Amino acid sequence: ASIIDPNAQLTTALLQTYGDFSLMDTYRSYITGFTQYYAGGWNVSNYAGAVYPKDSEMALLWNRYYSISIKNLVDAIYRSEDMPNTNAALRIHRAYMMALLSDIYGDIPCSEAGMSYINGNATPKYDTQEEVYNFVFSELKAAAAQLGTGTDLISGDVTSLESDVTAWKRYANTLRLRYAMRISDVAPEKAQEEFESALTADGGIISSGDEDAYVKYIDAPFTLYDGANDLDFRANALGEMIYGQDPTSPSFVCSTLYKYMETMNDPRLYRIARCYIHTTRSQTDTSGNYDVTDEVIAWGENGGLGIVPCNVGDAWWSDWVNAPATSDIPTLANLVSLYPEKGYDQNNYPARMIRPTIAVAFCNADCPGILITYAEVEFLLAEAASKGWNVSGSAKDHYEEG
């Protein structure tokens, strides 16, 4: 078609957020490694873990998000001035994407980005990160005020907001809380001003789990490295990437994160970190994983090593651990007995199963792509209270609610 519906462009940009397989290896290889969330998999150990820079890999997030999401959003914003609600939703997601890219890369083209076809500017200037964040705050406030001023339906919405202008307004206000807190160490007065302004903004903020904002995905087959199908954004590609593409290299939990949560008695630890026998990890059906977390813990309580997370920069086979005997893990013993030809006790699978990985529940194709949640709001309010900002409730109460 000679004219593209701006709502179709909104759908594309929203789905790409978590659905673009082509860029997700950068999250796994670098971002999760630098933050010491993951370790052990070949990619994260050899790139972030070993501090091995690969420009083409590190540039993927920018190259893909800019060429697809940003360009579509800017073009659709330009052509949807007679669609106030859709235009506002497009502006909100552009603000989300610009903040994301600036958080990763720092100074980026923002105010002039994506305008080449519109005004001929093929060399947009780089805005400083401060300018990017000021742009984001301004856009979120303006877009929230614009919502509800038209009668058009946000038909391209594929999020939990479900085309509801009041939900989009609430979402925009809530994002302001996040970005205000992000700058609180470098611009504390500006941060407090933006935060407190968002709290009292028309439309309110997310105030329950039912109001969480996320992109919806479907239970579609994983695309893996399937050529043109990488442009199919309907499944959660980040979940696919975290799951892994072969039995030997899923995303193991880094010892830094694991031990911190363990020391703090964090009740979320075993919701996030699980131990599996997963000889079928190369297949797209996640049902081929046998959860043996409780059995590995019991083995540790009876003199075995128990759960052994991977250390920073190590592959899962580094700092080699002695696997439990087949008889120590009842599920393993049962599988070996029932299916001796499948090699459950071979190829070092028993050694790998005591390395905790990300729970498969977070790796399904239809897992939601989180934009912002009520839990994060409560943590932000807790931090604001601890800073002495003008928020109701104590830091302790907000933290525990989160």
How should each PLM-predicted stretch be described?
Residues 40-93, 97-402:
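Structured, solvent-exposed acidic/aromatic patches
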Residues 1-36, 46-50, 59-60, 70-71, ...:
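Acidic, glycine-rich segments characteristic of secretory precursors and extracytoplasmic regions
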